[in-house]
């Protein structure tokens, strides 16, 4: 064994061994308990960042630990390879998205291997290959036949200059990110999957997810947004159709003083024909894309359409306004307004001088004061005719019943959740497998024409999708009739919604999934990824699992038993102000800092001498130039050090502050373990451990070893507090380093302890542990070694600590055998010099003894 720890030599050698032996390749084995450990698959952006490293290290620690428990562990990896960034990069680098993507995959795969992650590479998938997306296309056609897929027009962001659809992220201040043209809202036909058909089940089954974070479940509950209310129909004077609204507060119905419709509503469009102000307002709304999140804070605007609706219970005429806070794509595109009891309606009514009618009493029973704001709390009705005096629930039911009786209202459960629009007008995605005949008939692509392959050898102009720009690509025939292919591609959330299931059978050619393999491995036992995916990906992931279940492919209801959301990785951020007042962000690697006695940064400059402003720790990002390249750290310290720091610096679900001093500390610890094993093995063979022959000190040390095993097992396995597990191993190492190494049983005990330490560290630092296990004469490869088991007998305490008081004041602590009598404890206390001096020349008048805990001597 070399005296010096040299990670660069060890790590490449061990990685080669894993590759050659295919250590982490697994197959279904009914005789073993399975464990499926999955980290969210990466987008091949070009390089791994620290967020990736943290996510995958957590996954690898769990997988290696479970493997040592004797389970059949599947830990796969792949590439979420379609998406918009590839198109931008291709234009910038004058290439096509496919070669750019495949080059990135090759580079990042090498990076993952360098970090020593124990993946089953035989199951690697890239979602941009026809071998993968063909099954997604086939499944989509089956969902279409089941009535779960439909096409309808929907509003998108349209750049009139580039003649293309923009994602919300590509609209900057209402303009196209590329050419700065004013963006318009345009209705175009798009494909949707009916996720709303599963809304109730998606909501209900959240209760089954005991091992998912409550925050994620709450976010999904709110996103699905189930509400119970009443749908009410209004007649409108001089308009051919009725207006339908939905309300969760029918108790306030007698206070409805106006209706509001979306600018795109047919009623508003009709009224605009003779109303120039309204036409201009509709035009303005068309060109302002409003994210739902901004709705609450934006200025509420509207124009009177001139139409009057008839209140179904009072017969009163109430005005119908067009308003910018009503969205056509939500509900019916019309809302009833009760300004007395809804703040948004109140602000709008106050602005335009509309009637505000109170119908709910204040909590003290008085009429509410509406001079400043609406009264939004529930309460008792007044000003409501026959419903006066009713509280919320009774009023809800009475008014709902009355409306139903008159045929103008019905109770309804509504969801905030909208159907999933899966069409993207981009090139780099899986083609949507639908065709249109010359007579306009829309059909799914016949199975014998699947997959519809995306051409990869294309020229990108940065504006139009190559498959839209080439009219020949779309031409095909179906049953001998000419047809045109759909040129839209799937939303990339499609691929990431079922990849976890395909990992169970990536080579399977008979269909989307091999049910036998899928049902052996699924559900996923632990799924690890960022909380930013709480609603989009994690909802589609659950939805797709239910679709596959209903297609008979899987039997479980949910895709993953446990979800672990890792925290972000933060780093110091610095900038200097440039000549034009702009901020120039400087990498923390290039900042020369001065710290105070508490280690806080007080001054910083860069190599060019710029005075730097320190903004504190923030998420590693390109925009702040504060990302640390994992590659550089691995080259400097080794993969094991980077992994150990990642797991030790913070609990897995909390933010992690990147500190190179902490990385150095992790490196020093590994060197200490190496040094102790080196010194121990240099002394030659070790005798067998004879537990019965151990001295009290040796027993105490062995007790510490086994208590540590018990703690680390609990910390990793049950609590998943990996940082405290590492801290416990470090504490034990301190004791082992000070332990005597000369006697035969000292060395035998150290051998047992070091073999345990190396196995406990193996999930965190697998390369160095692989090597040290061999040096310690461990049986076989450590990858197949069992997890150490704590010896219950060794952990039994045979001594205990007793606090000694004289006249109620603590004067010392003594160690006594667990079974010591009161007499023996008193005798031992008298020998303790700190206690003895208080007993000199005095009489003990009374003794209070709490067995094994406290001895109080009352003297006079």
Swiss-Prot record:
Primary site of residence: cytoplasm
Catalytic reaction equation(s): tRNA(Leu) + L-leucine + ATP = L-leucyl-tRNA(Leu) + AMP + diphosphate
Location within or outside the cell: Cytoplasm
Taxonomy, superkingdom: Bacteria
HAMAP family in alphabetical order: Leu_tRNA_synth_B
Sequence similarity: Belongs to the class-I aminoacyl-tRNA synthetase family.
This protein's name: Leucine--tRNA ligase
């Amino acid at each position: 064994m070399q005296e010096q720890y040299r990670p660069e030599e060890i790590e490449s050698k061990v990685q080669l061994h894993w590759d050659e032996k295919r250590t982490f390749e697994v197959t279904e084995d009914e005789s073993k308990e399975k464990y499926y450990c999955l980290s969210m698959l990466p987008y091949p952006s070009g390089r791994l960042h620290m967020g990736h490293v943290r996510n995958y290290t957590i996954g690898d620690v769990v997988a290696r630990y479970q493997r040592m428990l004797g389970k059949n562990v599947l830990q796969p990896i792949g590439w979420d390879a379609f998406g918009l960034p590839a198109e931008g990069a291709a234009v910038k680098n004058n290439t096509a998205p496919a070669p750019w993507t495949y080059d990135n995959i090759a580079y990042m795969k090498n990076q993952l291997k360098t970090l020593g992650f124990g993946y089953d590479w035989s199951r690697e998938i890239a979602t941009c290959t026809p071998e993968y997306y063909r099954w997604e296309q086939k499944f989509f056609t089956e969902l279409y036949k089941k009535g779960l897929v439909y096409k309808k027009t929907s509003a998108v962001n349209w750049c009139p200059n580039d003649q293309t659809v923009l994602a919300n992220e590509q609209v900057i201040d209402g303009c196209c990110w590329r050419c700065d043209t004013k963006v318009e809202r345009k209705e175009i036909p798009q494909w949707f999957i009916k996720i709303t058909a599963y809304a109730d089940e998606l909501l209900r089954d959240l209760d089954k997810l005991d091992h998912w974070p409550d925050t994620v479940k709450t976010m999904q509950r709110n996103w699905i947004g189930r509400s119970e209310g009443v749908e009410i129909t209004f007649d409108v004077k001089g308009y051919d159709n009725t207006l339908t609204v939905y309300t969760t507060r029918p108790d306030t119905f007698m206070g409805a003083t106006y209706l509001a419709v979306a600018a795109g509503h047919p009623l508003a469009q009709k009224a605009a024909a003779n109303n120039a102000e309204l036409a201009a307002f509709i035009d303005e709304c068309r060109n302002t894309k409003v994210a739902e999140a901004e709705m609450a804070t934006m200025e509420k605007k509207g124009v009177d359409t001139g139409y009057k609706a008839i209140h179904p219970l009072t017969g009163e005429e109430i005005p119908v306004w067009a308003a910018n806070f009503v969205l056509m794509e939500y509900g019916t595109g019309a809302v009833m307004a009760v300004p007395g009891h809804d703040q948004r309606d109140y602000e709008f009514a106050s602005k335009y001088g509309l009637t505000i009618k109170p119908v709910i009493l204040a909590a003290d029973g008085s009429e509410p004061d509406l001079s400043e704001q609406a009264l939004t709390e529930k309460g008792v009705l007044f000003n409501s005719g026959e419903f006066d005096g009713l509280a919320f629930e009774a009023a809800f039911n009475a008014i709902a019943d009355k409306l139903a009786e008159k045929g103008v209202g019905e109770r309804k459960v509504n969801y905030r959740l909208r159907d999933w629009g899966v069409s993207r007008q981009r090139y780099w995605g899986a083609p949507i497998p639908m065709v249109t005949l010359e007579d306009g008939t829309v059909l799914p692509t016949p199975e014998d024409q699947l997959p519809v392959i995306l051409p990869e050898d294309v020229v990108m102009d940065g504006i139009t999708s190559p498959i839209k720009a080439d009219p020949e690509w779309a031409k095909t025939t179906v049953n001998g009739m000419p047809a045109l292919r759909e040129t839209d591609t799937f939303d990339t959330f499609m691929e990431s919604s079922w990849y976890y299931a395909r990992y169970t059978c990536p080579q399977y050619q008979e269909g989307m999934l091999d049910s036998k393999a899928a049902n052996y491995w699924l559900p996923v036992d632990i799924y690890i990824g960022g909380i930013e995916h709480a609603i989009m990906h994690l909802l589609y992931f659950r939805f797709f699992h239910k679709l596959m279940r209903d297609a008979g492919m899987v039997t479980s209801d949910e895709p993953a038993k446990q979800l672990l959301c890792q925290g972000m990785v933060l780093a110091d951020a610095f900038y200097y102000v440039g000549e034009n007042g702009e901020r120039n962000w400087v990498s923390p690697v290039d900042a020369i800092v001065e710290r105070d006695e508490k280690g806080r940064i007080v001054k910083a400059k860069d190599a060019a001498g710029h005075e730097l402003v320190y903004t504190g720790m923030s998420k590693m990002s390109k925009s702040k130039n504060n990302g640390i390249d994992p590659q550089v750290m691995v080259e400097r310290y080794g993969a094991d050090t980077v992994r150990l720091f990642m797991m030790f610096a913070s609990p897995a679900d909390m933010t992690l502050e990147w500190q190179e001093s902490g990385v150095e500390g992790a490196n020093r610890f590994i060197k200490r373990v190496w040094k102790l094993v080196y010194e121990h093995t240099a002394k030659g063979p070790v005798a067998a451990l004879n537990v019965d022959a151990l001295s009290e000190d040796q027993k105490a040390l062995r007790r510490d070893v086994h208590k540590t095993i018990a703690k680390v097992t609990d910390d990793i396995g049950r609590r998943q507090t990996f940082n405290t597990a590492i801290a416990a191993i470090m504490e034990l190492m301190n004791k082992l380093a000070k332990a005597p190494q000369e006697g035969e049983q000292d060395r035998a005990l150290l051998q047992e302890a070091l073999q345990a330490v190396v196995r406990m560290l193996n999930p965190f630092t697998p390369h160095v542990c692989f090597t040290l296990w061999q040096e310690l004469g461990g049986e076989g490869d450590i990858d197949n070694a069992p997890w150490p088991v704590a010896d219950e007998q060794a952990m039994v305490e045979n001594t205990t600590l007793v606090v000694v008081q004289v006249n109620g004041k603590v004067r010392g602590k003594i160690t006594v055998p667990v079974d010591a009598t009161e007499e023996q404890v008193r005798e031992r206390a008298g020998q303790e010099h700190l206690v003895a001096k208080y007993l000199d020349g005095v009489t003990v008048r009374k003794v209070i003894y709490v067995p094994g805990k406290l001895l109080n001597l009352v003297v006079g």
